[in-house]
Amino acid sequence: MAELSCDVLVIGGGATGVCAAYDAARRGLRVILAEMNDLSTGTSGRFHGLLHSGARYAVRDPESARECILENAILRRIAPHIIEDTGGLFVAVPGDPADYVPRWLEACAAAGIAAEAITVREARRQEPALSPALVHAFRVPDGAVDGFDMAHAFTRAAEDYGATTLIYHEVTALNVGSTGVMATLQDRRSGEEKIVSARWVINAAGPWAGKVAALAGYALRVAWSRGAMIAMNTRWVNTVINRLRPPTDGDILVPVGTVSVIGTTSIPVERPDDNTIEPWEITALLDEGEAIIPGFRQARALRAWAGVRPLYEAEAREGITGRAVRRTFDVIRHAPGLTTVVGGKLTTARLMAEKAVDDVCAGLGIEARCTTADEPLPGDHPRRLHMLGSRLDALEHGRMPGPLICECEMVTQAQIEEAIAAYARPPALDDLRRDLRLGMGPCQGGFCAVRAAGIVQRACNLDAAAATAALRAFVDERFKGGRSLLWGHHLRQFLLDEMIYRRTLGLDRLTGAPPAVRDAPLPAWAADRRPVSSSAQGRRVIVIGAGMAGLMAALHAVRAGAQVHVIAAGIGRLILAPGWCDVGPFHDHPGVRVFLDWCTDHGVRPLAGGPAMLGTRPAVSWAGDGEMLIVGFASWRDFYPMLCAGNLARQGIPARGIHVDLPRRHDGWDLSPTRLAHCFDDPAFREEVARLVKGRLRDEARVGFPAVLGLRDPAVVQRELAEQIGRPVFEIPTLPPSVPGTRLLNVLKGWLLRQGARVQIGHAVTRPVVEGRRVVGVAVASVGRETVFHADAVILATGGLYGGGLLSDDRGRLWEPIFDLPVQAQTDRLAWFNTDLLDLRGHPAHTFGIAVDEYLRPLGKDGTPAYENLFAAGHILGGMDTLIGGCEEGFDLASAYTAVREALGND
């Protein structure tokens, strides 16, 4: 058991704790800072990012207002690099109390807060998204501050003055005696304990301050108030927006990095870690955003979270609760050797620390004044205010040090490697998120998380099991913050993330027990084995949708002699397909057999199984037996061979991973799978790759590459590589866009065009043209006008919730947008998804879709076919979880075949 000693032990690594450590260290005291998690994982990392001017508190809490405006100026001076000078606007809309404005102005003046009246026109010129219904607008000196950057900046400054930081160390015992304090700290990662002997303890544990005081035998009543916030996926504003009214729910909108954060609520809770969010809070915050920015609630909500405010209970005992509790702070000396600082704001953390350390120095008889407000933090950080575009500017005009790993937040591989080097042991991906904002953008880690896991594994020499477990933990945590917002585009994002992590990576099978095989009954239409008609000459068929189901329906209709017109808003899910076709229980359906025959005829080689990107063991073997070599490229971000090989090896499949350099230097940090596939179409390029790989071969019997081996003629590329290397080669999926999926899309679309079909992608069908109970055509929006195309039969293959065939909103409404067909779904939106993204049972939302009769005709609201000649295929059909059932493509193939058969009749 290690034993440490110091003058001051600071407990709590939030804003107040790190400022206290810095202050005490500057005064010449020996300091240890202990935090039970990572820095700023409590209240300081779960707030809206506002650097307060104090104007919000001017009327109700003038003491806090004065503290905020003074500390606002000090932080700008000593740590400008963690602050974005957004400025602030206080705005009033109709319904806000008019009598509050003069009281607020008077209170701001008394607190020393500059509040400048501007016209509504000027406010909207500065922030065009604001409502034209504004009635008042005032400028104030608000700003945006990054709580994670603040914690790291002050911690590094404290360490420069000799402080020691112990993260993931929880205080489990605290004994305050006449000669000092003895504390027991437990490392939450290793279980090891440390004994710390200190002359004094500063309890800056925020919501946990009462628990820490209780360890020493002292009562401290802290009132916990939970506040919920939502991050929207874009910067609606570049200025902090406050409602000009008494503080209440949802009256602050803060531009933070690439997003906007609206908050907060104020709910009394019973635990310091109660970060739950209730549905009404989401609705209330969106409604309040709509009041100041029209269209706000229709935008994509990205993530919701809550933080717990530690309010000093002395106020609550007098019957004052919630927002009425003052937002200033208290410094409490329980006994010689133990001081607690509680309450306050992140904006006033430096001042809180100053007063706490003043109390310590007074108790120790030390004369050393606070100097933290006198000069900037030490270090080589910029001496200027943070600018949002600084990362992009560095990428565009500086030297690009390696690939861009997180496109949303512009995080490079070099930045991740630098952050990793600062840790004594391998960091969690969530640590890197707090350091770099990794995974905090619109994709919520869908693409960058596995890249970061691969980088951590390689940099720290982690085994594959540990790296994979870290990835799973990060994915689960990202989903937890997005689950309450799963509707619209955000729902589609998490469905995409789920497809990536289940199918392309195989993460669910590596980190959980295999799902039980479910013998689900086939729908009536799937059991019918009648063939498609071969005599539909001249019949006009419109297929809506260009995914697997839509294109295969078009193929079958063309082969039957129909005149086919494919209309689609986009290219469907084919570019997400990992490189194989899951046919599951539909393997003996004639639609699947037709597809496989067609693949053979057109040079498309369906492979019999293969590992997922993370090395999930396949159901069947591929490319023979024996050890395999997994090849990746050193400067390419979308495939990590050591991670794949390590996971294969722990499943009993001998494998070794290597990186080779790309033959030519590629300066672009956005080298996509399709661009790399084009490189492999060049014989000289692949010859050089083969030479590099052959030089690294040992006794491996086969070689696996990322699935980028050519776009034009992958069979030739693979054959030549195999000949040049002297081993069979095979492909392993990469992150989207999928090269195998793109190949299949190109081949299908090209074949249809050569057969005379019309393929119109990029135009949305807006409405049907109906005569009686028949659809005689569809209207398409194109170049500012509507065009009608006529048909004898229509096949609806627009996809499900991901593909856009079904739409959803925050109130739990689901609808089919073209024909207004009823949707089979649960009405409780929170029941659409289970708590874990990769739950092996799947999610109820997977089964949502339209109901059909045995002929695949969609049913209307009365339970009968909506139209005589409308048929459906693919993932718009409800009732089956094809992702968990292992029949994603099989379902598309079988339903497309059946829909065409019913639309055209059969021989």
Walk through the language-model features, giving the residues of each.
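Helical element adjacent to the flavin cofactor pocket in flavoenzyme catalytic cores
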Residues: 138-199, 645-649, 687-697, 710-767
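Core beta-strand elements of the Rossmann-like FAD/NAD(P) dinucleotide-binding domain
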Residues: 4-6, 191-200, 784-793, 866
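Flavin (primarily FAD) binding-site architecture
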Residues: 203-217, 796-812
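C-terminal catalytic lobe of FAD-dependent flavoproteins
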Residues: 147, 221-228, 234-236, 240, ...
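Short hydrophobic core segments
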Residues: 11, 196-206, 542-544, 789-799
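Glycine-rich FAD pyrophosphate-binding loop
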Residues: 25-45, 558-576
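Helix-loop-beta segment of a Rossmann-like dinucleotide-binding subdomain
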Residues: 85-90, 124-161, 182, 265-272, ...
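Dinucleotide-binding Rossmann-like beta1-alpha1 core, especially the glycine-rich loop
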Residues: 49-126, 493, 579-636, 641-648
